[in-house]
Every structure is written in C-alpha cells, then in structure tokens.
Regions:
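Flexible glycine-/small-residue-rich
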Residues: 12-14, 81, 101
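Hydrophobic beta-strand signal
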Residues: 64-65, 78
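PDZ-domain C-terminal substructure recognizer with occasional recognition of PDZ-binding tails
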Residues: 89-105, 110
C-alpha cells in the first residue's frame, strides 16, 4: 500500500451531452497522489455523452472534481440544472450564467439571475483534470 496515494471514490456519472439525470452511485475508486487532495472534498464522475470532446473529455473518461459552489468564468464544472448533473464550461456574462458545451452540435444554455437565485442552478464542483478510460 503506497502511503503517497489515496483512494478517491467514483460517485456516479455526469452527462457531457443533453440534459439527463446523473445518478450518484458508487462505481469504484481511483488512486490519486495525496498532494492532489489537500484542502477540500474530491471525487470522480464518469462522463456520458460527447458535448465536451472539444476539451478532450470523452465518453467513459473520469473527471476529477473538487467540490465547490462557485467557479471562475471559463472553468469546466459540474453543474446541477433542475437536479440533473451536467459537465460544461461555465461563463458569467453580467447577471447571467452560460453553460457552454465544447462541441458545436450543442447550443449554450443561458440562465438568468432569477433562475440561479431560485436554486434551479447549482455549481457542484470544478473539474481539475480528466482521466482517459478505454472501455
């Protein structure tokens, strides 16, 4: 057992495509260097869908997520939209939030300050990196 690594859970799946529910379910775990787990709560999600292929995130890849409720504009994040988990690049333009797919076949999703305040939109975490899985 290598004490310089820690097991991080794969909690479920996240859509990198059309809006659909992503179930939180234990899918296993991956080892991560201990220094990548400092100062926060971390988890992996398995990507389903092709909306983030332009960012080199493909179906079956694992995204490593740091749980947080805010991200900087331009960050790739896991965002709940009406209880459905989505993997998108997040932009803030004035009082609106834009969820952008890195695949031209998907349109941006734009949300008003009112929709965000109503808690229909919630940032779950920032994607720190992805891990290729060949399935």
């Amino acid at each position: 057992n290598d004490s310089s690594q820690i097991a991080i859970p794969i909690l479920g799946t996240v859509r990198g495509g059309p809006l659909r529910f992503a179930q939180e379910e234990w899918l296993g775990q991956e080892l991560v260097p201990l220094e990548e787990t400092v100062g926060g709560e971390y988890f992996y999600l398995e990507v389903i869908g092709d909306s983030m292929t332009g960012a080199r995130i493909y179906p079956s890849d694992l995204v490593y997520v740091k749980r947080c409720s805010m991200v900087n504009s331009g960050t790739i994040a896991v965002v709940l939209v009406n209880d459905e988990a989505n993997l998108k690049r997040v932009f803030f333009k004035g009082s609106t939030m834009v969820l952008h797919s890195e695949n031209p076949k998907y349109e941006d999703m734009v949300f008003s300050a009112q929709e965000i305040e109503a808690k229909d939109i919630q940032i779950i975490g920032e994607v720190l990196h992805s891990k290729i899985r060949f399935k």
